[in-house]
């Protein structure tokens, strides 16, 4: 009989609850790092969550590079951002699978991508403004949703998992918050 956490007919919540019940406290803690350790007794391989995709798959060899987010925002084109999210996810998945075949679970090989940056760029002194869609909350929301939907896909299984950057605290630099 298949373990409940492996049963694709169950909801993600049901599967996660079953898996969490099987893990020791130490095993649960080992999964909180970006470089999650394997849990051989449950068939869980090592996994590295650290990957970036703000404007294409970053630092993982050859990949399509798109303009910085602030430049993409200037298009006001949600369909374009959706397509860029799709392409980024497709390339990330291909790189993930190729690395996995070679037992490579290092940084920049996972399917959780730190993107998009949904912080609002309200202070020009902030050094990461180019990673955002600008200062307008409406535009940032529309473009962010389009990018995430493109990246994650419409299927039962996510193509890649978008992890929105910032939102509240990415403007924390050098020990203090920059106004913004």
Task: Place the predicted regions along the sequence by residue.
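Glycoside hydrolase catalytic-domain context in secreted enzymes
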Residues: 1-180
């Amino acid at each position: 009989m298949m373990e409940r956490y492996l049963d694709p007919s169950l909801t993600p919540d049901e599967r996660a609850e079953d898996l969490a019940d099987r893990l020791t406290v130490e095993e649960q803690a080992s999964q909180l790092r970006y470089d999650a350790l394997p849990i051989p007794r449950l068939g869980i391989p090592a996994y590295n969550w650290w990957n970036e995709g703000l404007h294409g798959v970053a630092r993982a060899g050859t990949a399509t590079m798109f303009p910085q987010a602030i430049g993409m925002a200037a298009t006001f084109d949600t369909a374009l951002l959706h397509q860029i999210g799709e392409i980024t996810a497709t390339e990330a998945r291909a790189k993930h699978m190729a690395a996995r075949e070679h037992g490579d679970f290092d940084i920049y090989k996972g399917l959780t991508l730190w993107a998009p940056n949904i912080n609002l760029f309200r202070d020009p002194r902030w050094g990461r403004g180019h990673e955002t869609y600008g200062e307008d909350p409406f535009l940032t929301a529309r473009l962010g949703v389009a990018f995430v939907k493109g990246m994650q896909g419409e299927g039962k299984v996510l193509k890649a998992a978008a992890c929105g950057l910032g939102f509240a605290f990415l403007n924390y630099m050098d020990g203090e918050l920059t106004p913004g």
